[in-house]
């Protein structure tokens, strides 16, 4: 068992677990970011200087001081510079532990989640608790950019291959945004499918759309966490296309009442958390 396997062996993901309905901050489990970043050759000097893992938590409930159940939806933004990412099933179990616990106010719930996540990931975390009414005037969002999915190409190999991006540019300078709804990877632990929409914004030599789409499709049988996939895509495009500016943003469909939306960039700030049609 290697160092990576040792670090992941204690995670609750993929294991039979009991649901604790009483608040328990120890349920949160960290995964060191350095494990995957070492594999990508990312040192302390990271190729991106803006970024976050943007979570939406749809299943939050607790009891008010009189014992009446309360509900909310939360946005959580975990800074990319944090030492750890949070394992998704442990986050779900942690949130479930609020179900039969009394809190004085929604603000106390929000502050508790923020504090516990910061302790888990060892970095900056922003949390905002929203009422259901907040979403009444929040329309389904669409990521801006040119869709590259409708290409008439034949694909027979679905193994991950970064070399599909070899010689992927031409000597035409552009600033453009490309979008694909065909991102699909698999959970590193369970192998369950993770479905996402990918946005790539860059400035530099024009990237060949066919090669880029083949590369995206090659994640189809690749096992890695959401955050790790986005950082891998960022590093591969930076290596093969050498853009002057680059943003990689993926919005994944929800599982277990949570969706994860990693954002990495070397030139623009983290966007707001706006739900797509598949979310």
From Swiss-Prot:
The active site is at residues 187, 194. InterPro entries: GTP-CH-I_C/QueF, NADPH_dep_7-cyano-7-deazaG_red, QueF, QueF_N, QueF_type2. It catalyses: 7-aminomethyl-7-carbaguanine + 2 NADP(+) = 7-cyano-7-deazaguanine + 2 NADPH + 3 H(+). One of its GO terms (cellular component) is cytoplasm. Gene3D superfamilies: 3.30.1130.10. It holds the Pfam family QueF_N. Catalyzes the NADPH-dependent reduction of 7-cyano-7-deazaguanine (preQ0) to 7-aminomethyl-7-deazaguanine (preQ1). PANTHER family: NADPH-DEPENDENT 7-CYANO-7-DEAZAGUANINE REDUCTASE. Homodimer. This is NADPH-dependent 7-cyano-7-deazaguanine reductase. The gene is queF.
């Amino acid at each position: 068992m290697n160092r990576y396997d040792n670090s992941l062996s204690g995670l609750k993901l993929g294991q039979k677990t009991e649901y604790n309905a009483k608040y328990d901050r120890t349920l949160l489990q960290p995964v060191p970011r350095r494990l995957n970043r070492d594999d990508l050759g990312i040192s302390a000097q990271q190729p991106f200087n803006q970024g976050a893992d943007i979570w939406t938590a749809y299943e939050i409930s607790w009891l008010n001081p009189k014992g009446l159940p309360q509900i909310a939806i939360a946005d959580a933004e975990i800074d990319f510079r944090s030492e750890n990412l949070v394992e998704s099933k442990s986050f779900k179990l942690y949130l479930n532990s609020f179900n039969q616990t009394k809190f004085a106010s929604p603000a106390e719930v929000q502050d508790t989640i923020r504090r516990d996540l910061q302790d888990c990931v060892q970095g900056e975390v922003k949390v905002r608790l929203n009422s259901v009414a907040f979403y009444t005037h929040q329309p389904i969002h669409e990521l801006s950019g040119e869709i590259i999915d409708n290409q008439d190409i034949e694909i027979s190999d679905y193994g991950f291959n970064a070399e599909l991006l070899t010689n992927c540019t031409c000597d035409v300078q552009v600033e453009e945004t490309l979008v694909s709804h065909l991102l699909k990877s698999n959970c590193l632990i369970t192998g369950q499918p993770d479905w996402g929409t990918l946005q790539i914004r860059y400035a530099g030599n024009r990237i060949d759309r066919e090669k880029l789409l083949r590369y995206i499709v090659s994640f189809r049988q690749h096992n890695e966490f959401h955050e790790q996939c986005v950082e891998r895509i960022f590093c591969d495009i930076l290596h093969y296309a050498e853009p002057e500016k680059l943003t990689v943003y993926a919005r994944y469909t929800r599982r277990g009442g949570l969706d994860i939306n990693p954002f990495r960039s070397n030139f623009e700030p983290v966007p707001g958390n706006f739900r797509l049609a598949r979310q």
